[in-house]
Amino acid sequence: MFPKLIAASLAALLLAPAAYAENFDVKMLNKGVEGAMVFEPAFVKAAVGDTVTFISTDKGHNVEDIKGMLPDGVEKFKSKMGEDYVLTIAAEGLYGVKCTPHYTMGMVALIQAGAPVNKDAVAAVSLKGKAKARFEPLVAQIVK
């Protein structure tokens, strides 16, 4: 009886973080509150273990990491065009994302998971034009 109780308690403890994981929906839009070609919301404050679901509300969009804007050890990602994509937050830090065909039009987003441990690396990435203009206010929302 006692070993079964210990095993059940350990299983409950190991599964507990998954039970508290949260999902955030981010729409990929042709037109939104911030103008044309946007993610809404463009800034997400998540935790390790949470998921972010990018919803292809308007077709012709995808989601891809911005080179140099992922925490150490996190694998690069790129979704198929016009399909929803679920990103599981695997590590603490900042995740810069873009819509590949609309990147130059400023279709960017930022996810913060826990402490911004890779903030310096994200700041070192050179964005241009509308992508830079839209990304700067997102960086200003980072919580230390």
Predicted segments with their positions:
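Bacterial N-terminal signal peptides that target proteins for export
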Residues: 1-7
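N-terminal signal peptide c-region/cleavage motif recognized by signal peptidases
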Residues: 16-18
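Extracytoplasmic copper-binding redox domains, predominantly the cupredoxin/blue-copper superfamily
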Residues: 20-144
